[in-house]
Amino acid sequence: MKDQKVIVALDYDNQADALTFVDKIDPSSCRLKVGKEMFTLFGPEFVKELHKRGFSVFLDLKFHDIPNTCSKAVRAAAEMGVWMVNVHASGGERMMSASREILEPYGSDRPLLIGVTVLTSMEQQDLAGIGLDIAPQEQVKRLAALTKNSGLDGVVCSAQEASMLKADLGKEFQLVTPGIRPAGADVGDQKRIMTPVDAITAGSDYLVIGRPITQAENPSQVLNEINLSLASVL
């Protein structure tokens, strides 16, 4: 199966609505992201429903805790059979290393383990508000390097940082990019955004796209158009 680049962010507070949407799209066209709200509302059974329909799932819970607790949460995600799971890189090297090591018994079946650097809604004044006198891009570089040194597979980052991180950390280090909006789509609450083609060209490996697909009249068509546009740069 080809490596789908698009990850559709499912942001629903009603499980029936979510599954109605999911049944309109093809598992060969994308992967799905389940975040905190949906997982808190619907739990592991919802992830199982997505797996039954043939979708790979990115469990976007951004674990951040002491190493023992965080690593056990990551192991629970692996037991669920998800394709990708993430942790906050600001949790530090010991937390990330413990989370990576606990996945060793799963071999090639283990989920990709991704670090979260700087949330795409954060600007320099937001970082200053939590005591970090540093530009977002510099904090991303610092946390991404820490993530790689901890043995993780990649990071979540904005597309603007993708080319820099590929140059610094190598082509094998996976970059997962939210804040992606097809040309002409509403920006929403993401501060640092880019189109799908621009993001892949810049070095992003996977693109997280939500409302432009989930709120489309014909989500399957939107997905096909995005994938066709990406075919020219892959």
Swiss-Prot record:
Domain of life: Bacteria
Pathway: Pyrimidine metabolism; UMP biosynthesis via de novo pathway; UMP from orotate: step 2/2
SMART domains: OMPdecase
Transmembrane segments: none
Keywords carried by this UniProt record: Decarboxylase, Lyase, Pyrimidine biosynthesis
A Pfam family hit: OMPdecase
GO molecular function, one term: orotidine-5'-phosphate decarboxylase activity
GO annotation (BP), single: 'de novo' pyrimidine nucleobase biosynthetic process
EC number of the protein: 4.1.1.23
Catalytic activity: orotidine 5'-phosphate + H(+) = UMP + CO2
Positions of substrate binding: 11, 33, 60-69, 120, 181, 190, 210-211
Any one cellular-component term (Gene Ontology): cytosol
Positions annotated as active site in the UniProt record: K62
Name of the top EC class for this enzyme: lyase
Function (record text): Catalyzes the decarboxylation of orotidine 5'-monophosphate (OMP) to uridine 5'-monophosphate (UMP).
Oligomer status and interactors: Homodimer.
NCBIfam families membership: PRK00230.1, pyrF
Protein family (similarity comment): Belongs to the OMP decarboxylase family. Type 1 subfamily.
Name used for this protein in its record: Orotidine 5'-phosphate decarboxylase
Record organism: Aliivibrio fischeri (strain ATCC 700601 / ES114) (Vibrio fischeri)
